[in-house]
Amino acid sequence: MSKNFIVLDVEGYSTCKPYNIGYIVGNKSGEILSGKSFALMPAVWDNIQYKIKTMNVDGLASAHEMAHNNIKEILCTDNEKYTKVFDNHKFFGEFLTDITKYDIKRVWAYNCTFDKGALTRLFTEEQNTIVNNLVTFCDIIPAILYTKLLNKEYIEWCKKNGYLTAKGNVQTKAEVVYRYLTGNLEFVEEHTGLADCKIEYEILLNAMKETKSPRRTPCQAWKIIQKFCECEGIDIPALDNK
């Protein structure tokens, strides 16, 4: 199997086509062979419309703020941070070219169900078939969960630093995991495709250093951690509130 793989991150509402897609081509040694960030202009308006329609929906405030900042940056700057494409077929062409050029067999993403779903909405049926015949989508969450997070140290660290959900579950989002792995409690995820890819790549490399075959099937990390706590007698609020 090819030693190269893609780490991909998309930005956009879960019911819309993504307005920003970033990905890097790398390998287990930490070498980044390519990095790209695309602003998909046809999808920008779709996401703006969705934001307007759901302004008063509970639970979407942070998503709205993130979309507002990202789209504002895309529309108001001419810097080289994004490659603006006005035809989704152009992105598909570049993505397919890199898959072929670097002999990619696996595409990794943090919570890959979301990212793969976004690509499915973006691509035509034929394009989806082509991509799915060439690569397997893999989830970074189980890879890092079973190598670095499913232990008392991580759970106690989350409790100490307040990284629990409103229901008391241990958080496993990329920003929190990256803070844990690096010791940098001030780190803030940028929430743009290429920037997030870079930290997710580092997270994946941490998992790959621990095992030759990291787990890659999507899972409910919070539930697995909760079950681990029950078995190990670790006290967390989620267990107290049953």
Task: Mark where each language-model region is.
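Short, glycine/acidic-enriched loop or turn micro-motifs at the edges of active sites
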Residues: 12-14, 142, 199
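A short, structured active-site edge motif that brings together acidic residues
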Residues: 38-41, 132-149
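Short, polar/flexible loop-turn hinges at active-site or ligand-entry regions and domain interfaces
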Residues: 78-82, 126-131, 184-190
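Acidic, Mg2+-coordinating catalytic module of metal-dependent nucleases/exonucleases
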Residues: 102-112, 117-118, 159-238
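Substrate-recognition/cap helix-loop segment adjacent to the acidic, metal-dependent catalytic center
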Residues: 113-137
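Acidic catalytic cores of enzymes that act on phosphate-bearing nucleotides/polynucleotides
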Residues: 240-242
